[in-house]
């Protein structure tokens, strides 16, 4: 539980790093608390704010609270710089804005949005893993070919050249 001293430290830290905390009882959000107002993100720890610490985590779909006011399906647009998820709800973060998760307004003109950065990072990691797998597979095939060639060479009988004697 967050006591008043801890809450004050969180608010001071948020001010120093340039994020905005929502007004309301302790700025809490998520299941049981509801969403954030004014286009703010709900952090993985359940507090409203802006910036990567609040918007960069992947919100599980079970925690996305559907409300008629937050629906965008059919229109594909959301206010406050939020994305319209493929499930038809407005929000921020990879669950709404990530590659393959967004419809309509997907922040194509905001390449530095935390969700876009995370999506590009995940795509680059997947590509690097695929390349590493392909290189390892190719190396294994070359090694197997080399071993098979060596085995064939050793299995062939050694024939010594015939020596003929002069009469």
From Swiss-Prot:
Residues 1-22 form the signal peptide. It comes from Stellaria media. Disulfide bonds join 29-42, 36-48, 41-55, 72-84, 78-90, 83-97, 102-106. SMART domains: ChtBD1. One of its GO terms (molecular function) is chitin binding. Residues 26-66, 69-108 form the Chitin-binding type-1 domain. This is Antimicrobial peptide 1. The keyword Flavoprotein does not apply. InterPro entries: Chitin-bd_1, Chitin-binding_1_CS, Endochitinase-like_sf. Induction: Strongly induced (up to 70-fold) by infection with phytopathogenic fungi like R.solanum, F.culmorum and B.cinerea. Keywords: Antimicrobial, Chitin-binding, Disulfide bond, Fungicide, Signal. Transmembrane segments: none annotated. GO terms for biological process: defense response to fungus; killing of cells of another organism. SUPFAM superfamilies: Plant lectins/antimicrobial peptides. Expressed in roots, flowers and, to a lesser extent, in stem and leaves. PROSITE patterns: CHIT_BIND_I_1 (PS00026), CHIT_BIND_I_2 (PS50941). Residues 58-67, 101-167 form a propeptide.
């Amino acid at each position: 539980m967050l006591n008043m001293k801890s809450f004050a430290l969180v608010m001071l830290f948020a001010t120093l790093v340039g994020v905005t905390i929502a007004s309301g009882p302790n700025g809490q959000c998520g299941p049981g608390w509801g969403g954030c107002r004014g286009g703010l993100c709900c952090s993985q720890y359940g507090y409203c704010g802006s910036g990567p610490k609040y918007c960069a985590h992947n919100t599980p779909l079970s925690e996305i609270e559907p409300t008629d006011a937050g629906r965008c399906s059919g229109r594909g647009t959301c206010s406050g710089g939020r994305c319209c998820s493929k499930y038809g709800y407005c929000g921020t973060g990879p669950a709404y804005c990530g590659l393959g998760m967004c419809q309509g307004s997907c922040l194509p003109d905001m390449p530095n949005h935390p969700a876009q950065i995370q999506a590009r990072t995940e795509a680059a990691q997947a590509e690097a893993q695929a390349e590493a797998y392909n290189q390892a597979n190719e190396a294994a095939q070359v090694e197997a070919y080399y071993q098979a060639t060596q085995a064939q060479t050793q299995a062939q009988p050694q024939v010594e050249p015939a020596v003929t004697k002069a009469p």
